[in-house]
Amino acid sequence: MLSAAVLCVQAASACTVPAGFTRLVSPEAEIAYRWEPERLEVGQFFAAEVIACRAPGPEAVREVVLDAQMPAHGHGMNYRPTATQQASDRFRITGLMLHMAGRWRLTFDLVQGDRRTRLSRDVDLKP
């Protein structure tokens, strides 16, 4: 089952990141995020607060998509998260759950027109 959270956001540029956020940077884009609660546990719902800091090109970022997959198992999350916009470059995603221990790949897609820029982070979830 493919789960994704989608939210429309406006153009983002390099930003000041509040304490407690982690930056995720590629040559093309940058976001900052934090988990709530901070420590992820197997089978526990959590939320993500995300700031879209920078994306390529002149077009505004119109969507941010958050998803999680287990590459070794070929599946994703069992629940469909919900995104809520908090500001033009900031949003909160709830209803996230990593239901198994192991390596998860979390992807954050910034969508501008026909262009999609992906940032990803692997998380090793212990039992």
Regions found by a protein language model. Give the residues of each.
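Bacterial N-terminal signal peptides
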Residues: M1-Q10
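Contiguous segments within soluble domain cores/interaction surfaces
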Residues: S13-R105, D109-P127
